[in-house]
Amino acid sequence: MVQLWKLVLLCGLLAGTSASLPDIRGNDVLRKLKSGLERGLDTFDSTIEIIFQNLKTELESRCSDEVVEQQETENFLEQLISRIFQVVSRLTGVRIRNVQVPDITFEATSENSANVLIPITADVTVSLPFLGEIVDLDLNVDLQTTVSIETDTEDPQVVVGECTNNPESISLTVLHSRFGLVNDVVDIGVNLARRVVSSVVEGELCPRFRELLESLDAECVEKLIGESQDTTQQEPEGSR
């Protein structure tokens, strides 16, 4: 049950009589996050870089003759993204947890190119000063880019496309609101979460994703593209 003083404060906020506290809070959150992203989130948690290097090694091993379970790569991805969001939670008060990466896929578009997708799901809780936790959300966001092999030169080169960051592609579903059906409060929470996630995608996740793919040599990328073509050809007609 919401305490009476919180309801009084809430009414003041919605009426615009409390100096637009949620707006100030939102801007302050984004300033702190921007500063953290500029410094590098691994300066707050050195484990991020360790996990990232392990992930690079694991993905490279998928291109070798060794048998490596794809699930191992996904586990490192989950560990990496979870650590990143833990730092974000400390900086912003927007708590992002229970991160899951169902898979990482290479979808061949030609013999030398593919779309690469990393779908991410997580639980989000947004807190505001004085009001505390205001809304729980379900997060779905896809990291998407392209990778190709340029064969015009003597040594084939790996070319990685832009990692898309469209805030509207970030899906946030309301699971529970501490203030019932007060839409303005829910909107504040959803919009703040969207801006935080969008900033993290642009400033941390996409650069990591790009660096991960650029670390692979042309032979490795060619093999990953070939594996995706084989998988597509083996799918039953009705499952496509």
Swiss-Prot record:
Secretion signal span: 1-19
Cell compartments where the protein resides: Secreted
Disulphide linkage map: C163-C206
InterPro entries: Bactericidal_perm-incr_a/b_dom, BPI_fold-antibacterial, Lipid-bd_serum_glycop_N
Source organism, top-level taxon: Eukaryota
Tissue spec: Parotid glands.
Keyword set, alphabetical order: Disulfide bond, Secreted, Signal
Family: Belongs to the BPI/LBP/Plunc superfamily. Plunc family.
Full protein name: Short palate, lung and nasal epithelium carcinoma-associated protein 2B
Organism listed in the record: Bos taurus
Gene it is expressed from: SPLUNC2B
